[in-house]
């Protein structure tokens, strides 16, 4: 990707467009065209105000794996440079809906559930309705994303605490390294061996999950009060 080209990005779970959003850093560093998707209308209106002079579109529709491709098509983002997903729910199913619709960004990032280290797999599934999820049972594990990424020709290149970054293999530069087969190593580098207790203090009471065996973790998850057998799978 040439730095001089316009970066087209889609921020799914954009919030107010500033805090935890990719819109601000990208717009300050590159020529951008963006789509900010956020169902919280008040937050989206704040984003609309601060980016009124930018080539940004705004969407407050609730997304699901079925309608996501139509929404991206409606706003003209069928070939985006970068897609970010952070909805704290069926994030992986939403990503599947995008990639299986042949919308293949050069880069995507997704928030992972940091309490499930590779090789353990966990995900919240979409079952036809929007149901909020809460810590510690939300989103998906890093390994679950890596499996989908490998299938769709993407490489895991970085993990910044609970945000994983993937690059389409045809866009990989020579200085980038794929961690698809070494996801546990990257998890240790990007999360486990860093100051996560300071940044994620609410995770400390689940620290024993990080050291559990497969059998132990399966039991811990399924007996947790937030576990929903109809929507959550650990495998």
Q: How would you name each of these model-derived features?
A:
Residues 1-7, 164-181:
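Accessory recognition modules or surfaces
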Residues 171-200:
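Flexible, glycine-/basic-rich loop-and-beta segments that form/coincide
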Residues 1-74, 78-85, 114-117, 192-213, ...:
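SAM cofactor-binding core of SAM-dependent methyltransferases
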Residues 117-167:
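A conserved mid-domain beta-alpha-beta active-site/ligand-binding segment of alpha/beta enzyme cores
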Residues 84-97:
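Active-site glycine- and acidic-residue-rich loops that bind
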Residues 26-30, 98-105:
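Short, conserved loop/helix-junction motifs that constitute active-site signature segments
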Residues 216-233:
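Anion-recognition interface
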Residues 104-114:
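Conserved beta-strand signature within the Rossmann-like core of class I S-adenosyl-L-methionine
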């Amino acid at each position: 990707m040439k730095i001089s080209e316009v970066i087209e990005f889609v921020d799914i779970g954009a919030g107010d467009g500033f805090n935890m959003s990719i819109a601000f850093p990208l717009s300050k560093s590159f020529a951008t065209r963006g789509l900010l998707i956020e169902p919280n209308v008040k937050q989206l209106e704040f984003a609309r105000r601060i980016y009124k002079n930018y080539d940004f579109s705004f969407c407050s529709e609730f997304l699901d794996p079925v309608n996501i491709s139509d929404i991206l098509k409606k706003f003209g983002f069928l070939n985006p440079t970068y897609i970010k997903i952070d909805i704290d729910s069926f994030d992986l199913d939403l990503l599947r809906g995008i990639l299986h619709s042949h919308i293949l960004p050069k880069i995507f990032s997704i928030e992972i559930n940091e309490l499930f280290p590779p090789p353990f797999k966990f995900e919240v599934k979409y079952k036809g309705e929007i149901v909020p999820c809460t810590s510690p049972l939300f989103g998906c594990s890093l390994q679950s994303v890596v499996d989908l990424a490998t299938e769709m020709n993407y490489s895991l290149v970085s993990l910044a605490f609970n945000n994983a970054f993937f690059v389409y293999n045809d866009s990989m530069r020579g200085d980038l390294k794929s961690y698809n087969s070494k996801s546990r190593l990257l998890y240790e580098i990007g999360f486990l061996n860093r100051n996560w207790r300071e940044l994620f203090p609410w995770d400390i009471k689940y620290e024993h999950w990080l050291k559990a065996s497969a059998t132990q973790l399966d039991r811990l998850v399924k007996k947790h009060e937030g576990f929903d057998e109809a929507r959550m799978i650990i495998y």
